[in-house]
């Protein structure tokens, strides 16, 4: 619903974003996410979330879009509020961290 930060992966050059999802469905819904952006993909707003999970406040309005909603690459907790991210390209940490992402959460 609300992409907050966006950047290119240093090795693959794919475009990635963090997303703060919608409110109003309880403390445990809807999970925020971190994902690569795919050309032509639909990520759900406002009809679905995290794949074909129909948004109850818009039930039955667009079953065609609900059915084709893309599941994000990394599902985070609800309301974690990732504010930024960076892909690590340094050599200070072990090699397994290289090209991985560090996510910055609010609070």
Residue ranges: model-predicted function:
Residues 2-107:
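Beta-propeller domain segments
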């Amino acid at each position: 619903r609300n992409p907050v930060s966006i950047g290119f992966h240093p090795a693959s050059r794919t475009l990635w974003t963090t997303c703060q999802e919608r409110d109003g469905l309880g403390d445990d819904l809807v999970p925020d996410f971190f994902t690569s952006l795919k050309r032509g993909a639909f990520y759900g707003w406002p009809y679905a979330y995290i794949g074909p999970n129909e948004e109850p406040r818009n039930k039955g309005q667009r079953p065609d879009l609900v059915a084709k909603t893309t599941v994000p690459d990394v599902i985070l907790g609800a309301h974690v509020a990732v504010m930024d991210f960076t892909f690590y390209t340094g050599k200070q940490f072990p090699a397994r961290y290289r090209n991985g992402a560090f996510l910055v959460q609010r609070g």
